[in-house]
């Protein structure tokens, strides 16, 4: 998607503070952090939202949840104190960029409800 900012970040056409990258995903610091550690994890391939994941995306989803998030939580030293993972989906869900992304937040106590 030529106008998708996250596609531009994934393709290194836009600047970001990358903390981790592999063949499937890129993870970078949020430009408007809501916690001391606020990382966005995005697939390199354009997927509009969680609702657009297909059965052939199982490996990608599993990789993010089982490999990438635990690795980042460990690297950021938030795995023992706790963290939150958020996926905003659709307008009412608070999704502001139409590219699937996972928020990893930590480094402070999280409250409920989130707002």
Residue ranges of predicted features:
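HIT superfamily nucleotide-processing domains
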Residues: 1-115
């Amino acid at each position: 998607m030529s106008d998708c900012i996250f596609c531009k970040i994934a393709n290194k056409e836009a600047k970001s503070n990358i903390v981790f990258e592999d063949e499937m995903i890129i993870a970078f610091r949020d430009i408007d952090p809501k916690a001391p550690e606020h990382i966005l994890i995005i697939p390199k391939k354009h997927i509009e939202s969680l609702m657009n994941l297909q059965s052939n995306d199982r490996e990608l989803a599993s990789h993010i949840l089982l490999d990438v998030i635990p690795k980042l939580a460990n690297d950021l030293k938030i795995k023992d104190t706790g963290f939150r993972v958020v996926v905003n989906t659709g307008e009412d869900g608070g999704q502001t960029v139409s590219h699937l992304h996972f928020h990893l937040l930590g480094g402070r106590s999280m409250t409920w409800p989130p707002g």
